[in-house]
């Protein structure tokens, strides 16, 4: 499937607004709530999930700009990359992560607007491309963040994933 700049930007803005609406009103206790994860994975909180979403959005902007991957991220598999993000951000405040989330959205939109047309229409891509800007974000928003901030009784009935 070929995409248009306008369609990708529209999807990106739509998901950002949904996510920002949720995280903008979190209490300090909600930021610290654990999200459903297998015991073998790092113990993410709501804050860690937002940092994860934001990192991969920033990585998409980097890729769209044609910038190289940072040396410390080269050659990492998905689990190793996710762990690196967790270790970088786990001691940072929710305020820092929220500010980064908002700055990265500006960076993403700038990258999308500045990208050559061939980025969007040069080759066929998956329907949800670029996935980290909407589908991946929506998945973590719904399955991690929104689930974790539900009432505790409903949260306990949720099954762990990943």
Q: Which role does the model predict for each range below?
A:
Residues 16-27, 57-62, 102-116, 142, ...:
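Structural signal for well-ordered, non-membrane alpha-helices
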Residues 15, 81-119:
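Acidic/histidine-rich alpha-helical segments that form the ligand environment
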Residues 1-18:
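Extreme N-terminal tail/first-helix region
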């Amino acid at each position: 499937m070929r995409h248009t700049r306008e369609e990708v930007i529209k999807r990106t803005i739509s998901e950002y607004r949904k996510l920002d609406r949720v995280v903008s009103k979190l209490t300090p206790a909600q930021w610290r709530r654990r999200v459903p994860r297998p015991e073998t994975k790092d113990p993410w909180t709501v804050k860690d999930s937002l940092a994860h979403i934001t990192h991969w959005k920033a990585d998409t902007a980097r890729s769209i700009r044609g910038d190289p991957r940072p040396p410390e991220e080269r050659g990492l598999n998905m689990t190793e990359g996710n762990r690196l993000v967790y270790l970088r951000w786990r001691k940072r405040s929710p305020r820092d992560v929220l500010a980064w989330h908002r700055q990265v959205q500006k960076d993403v939109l700038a990258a999308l607007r500045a990208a050559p047309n061939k980025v969007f229409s040069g080759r066929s891509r998956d329907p949800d491309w670029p996935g980290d800007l909407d589908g991946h974000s929506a998945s973590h928003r719904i399955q991690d963040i929104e689930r974790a901030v539900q009432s505790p009784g409903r949260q306990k009935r949720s099954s762990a994933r990943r």
